C-alpha cells in the first residue's frame, strides 16, 4: 500500500511511525492538537519533547486541521493515548475517507466503560466499521523504532485482508509485522502488561533483583492470560509479540514510562511525584483501575494487579504489598490458568 497516510497524534509513537511510513514512500500528514508542537516539528523536523534526537523527513507535514489531515487518506493511524481515543475517533468520523484502513496503536482500556479500544471505536462508529479496524501492538519503543533498530510487531483484525494491508503498509527491513485474527487478545496484552511493568519498576525501586522481576513477569503473564481467556482471547496470543513480547520489553527497558514511574514509587515517591518525573502518559495507572474492576466483574483472581492498585490508590507501602504477595496461600502453578480455561470451555479439568 502506498499513497497518503494520516497519523492522528504527535506523541513519540505517532512520530516514530510517521517517520517509518515516510521513509517507505507514503505521503504522511500528522495531526496535532498543539499549534506550538506543529510549528516546532514543521520548522525543525524534530519532535523535541516526545522524540528528541530523531530527525523527520522533510516531506512530513504537521497540521492542526483534522479534515485536511484525513482528506483522501488511504490509511488512518490513531496515535493518541487511550484516554483520548474516543474523542479523536468521534471527531474523525465525518472526515474518514471511504474504504480507508483504520489502524489503532493505543494500548489501554477505557476506564469509565471498561472497553477495549476496538469496542470504543465500534460504539462511536458502528459495528460495521470494525471491518476496517486493525490494531497494531507488540514490543516497540518509539525511541528504537525511530532509529531503525530491528523491531517485530503484530497486527490484528477480524478482517485478515485488512490486517495484511497494514502488514504491507508498515513492513520493512527494520520493522517486521505479523498478523493475528485475535483482536481481543492483542488489545488486552498490550494494555495489561503496563500494570506488571509498574510492578517491576516498583521492585527495582525497592532494590530487589532479577529473581523478583522474573517472578512478577511470569505470574503477571498468568494474570493477563486468565482475564484474557475469560474475555474471549485466544490463550496462544499471550505467548506472542503482544503478550510476552511486549511484557518483557515494558518491564525491562530504560525507555518504559511505566517501569520508570514504578521505580520512583518504589523509591518512596508518591504517584503524583512519579508521574511528574516521567512527564509523559503512563498508561498503566488508568489501566490498573480498569483491570481491577474487570477482575471483579469476571471473578478472575489478579493478585499482582490488586496489590499494585493498593499501592497506587490506597496508600499501601510497596514493601508491604510484596510481603502480601509472597505470603499468599499456596497453589498449584497451573491451577488458576486451568480454572480460567475451564470457565470458557477451552479445556476440561
Curated annotation (Swiss-Prot):
Lipid biosynthesis keyword on record: yes
GO BP, one annotated term: glycerol-3-phosphate catabolic process
Catalytic activity: sn-glycerol 3-phosphate + NAD(+) = dihydroxyacetone phosphate + NADH + H(+); sn-glycerol 3-phosphate + NADP(+) = dihydroxyacetone phosphate + NADPH + H(+)
Pathway, per record: Membrane lipid metabolism; glycerophospholipid metabolism
Binding site for NADPH: 12-13, 107, 142, 257, 281, 283
Catalytic center residues: 193 (proton acceptor)
A Gene Ontology term for the protein's cellular component: cytosol
Gene Ontology molecular function terms on file: glycerol-3-phosphate dehydrogenase [NAD(P)+] activity; NAD binding
Keyword Transport in annotation: no
Source domain of life: Bacteria
Subcellular location: Cytoplasm
Pfam annotation, one family: NAD_Gly3P_dh_N
Enzyme class, first EC level, given as a word: oxidoreductase
Sorted UniProt keywords: Cytoplasm, Lipid biosynthesis, Lipid metabolism, NAD, NADP, Nucleotide-binding, Oxidoreductase, Phospholipid biosynthesis, Phospholipid metabolism
Enzyme Commission no: 1.1.1.94
Signal peptide range in chain numbering: none
Residues holding sn-glycerol 3-phosphate: 107, 138, 140, 193, 246, 256-258
Major place of residence: cytoplasm
Function: Catalyzes the reduction of the glycolytic intermediate dihydroxyacetone phosphate (DHAP) to sn-glycerol 3-phosphate (G3P), the key precursor for phospholipid synthesis.
PANTHER family: GLYCEROL-3-PHOSPHATE DEHYDROGENASE (PTHR11728), GLYCEROL-3-PHOSPHATE DEHYDROGENASE [NAD(+)] 2, CHLOROPLASTIC (PTHR11728:SF1)
The family this protein is said to belong to: Belongs to the NAD-dependent glycerol-3-phosphate dehydrogenase family.
Stated name of the protein: Glycerol-3-phosphate dehydrogenase [NAD(P)+]
Source organism: Pelotomaculum thermopropionicum (strain DSM 13744 / JCM 10971 / SI)
Lineage: Bacteria, Bacillati, Bacillota, Clostridia, Eubacteriales
Amino acid at each position: 500500500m502506498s499513497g497518503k497516510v494520516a497519523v492522528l497524534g504527535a506523541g513519540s509513537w505517532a512520530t516514530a511511525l510517521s517517520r517509518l511510513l515516510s521513509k517507505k514512500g507514503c505521503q504522511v500528514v500528522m495531526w496535532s492538537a498543539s499549534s506550538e508542537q506543529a510549528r516546532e516539528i514543521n520548522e525543525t523536523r524534530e519532535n523535541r519533547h516526545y522524540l528528541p534526537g530523531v530527525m523527520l523527513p522533510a516531506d512530513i507535514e504537521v497540521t492542526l486541521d483534522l479534515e485536511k489531515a484525513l482528506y483522501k487518506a488511504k490509511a488512518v493511524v490513531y496515535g493518541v493515548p487511550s484516554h483520548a481515543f474516543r474523542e479523536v475517533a468521534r471527531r474523525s468520523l465525518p472526515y474518514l475517507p471511504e474504504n480507508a484502513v483504520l489502524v489503532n496503536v493505543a494500548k489501554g482500556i477505557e476506564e469509565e466503560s471498561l472497553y477495549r479500544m476496538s469496542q470504543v471505536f465500534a460504539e462511536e462508529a458502528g459495528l460495521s466499521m470494525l471491518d476496517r479496524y486493525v490494531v497494531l501492538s507488540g514490543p516497540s519503543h518509539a525511541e528504537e523504532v525511530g532509529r531503525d533498530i530491528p523491531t517485530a510487531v503484530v497486527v490484528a483484525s477480524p478482517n485478515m485482508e485488512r490486517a495484511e494491508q497494514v502488514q504491507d503498509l508498515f513492513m520493512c527491513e527494520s520493522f517486521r509485522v505479523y498478523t493475528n485474527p485475535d483482536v481481543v487478545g492483542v488489545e488486552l496484552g498490550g494494555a495489561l502488561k503496563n500494570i506488571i511493568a509498574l510492578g517491576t519498576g516498583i521492585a527495582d525501586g525497592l532494590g530487589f533483583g532479577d529473581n523478583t522481576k522474573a517472578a512478577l513477569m511470569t505470574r503477571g503473564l498468568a494474570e493477563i492470560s486468565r482475564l484474557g481467556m475469560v474475555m474471549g482471547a485466544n490463550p496462544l496470543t499471550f505467548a506472542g509479540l503482544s503478550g510476552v513480547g511486549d511484557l518483557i520489553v515494558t518491564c525491562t527497558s530504560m525507555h518504559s514510562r511505566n517501569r520508570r514511574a514504578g521505580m520512583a514509587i518504589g523509591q518512596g515517591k508518591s504517584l503524583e511525584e512519579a508521574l511528574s518525573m516521567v512527564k509523559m502518559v503512563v498508561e498503566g495507572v488508568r489501566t490498573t483501575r480498569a483491570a481491577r474492576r474487570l477482575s471483579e466483574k469476571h471473578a478472575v483472581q489478579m493478585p499482582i494487579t490488586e496489590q499494585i492498585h493498593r499501592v497506587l490508590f490506597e496508600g499501601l507501602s510497596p514493601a508491604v504489598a510484596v510481603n502480601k504477595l509472597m505470603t499468599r496461600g499456596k497453589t498449584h502453578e497451573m491451577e488458576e490458568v486451568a480454572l480460567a480455561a475451564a470457565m470458557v470451555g477451552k479445556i476440561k479439568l
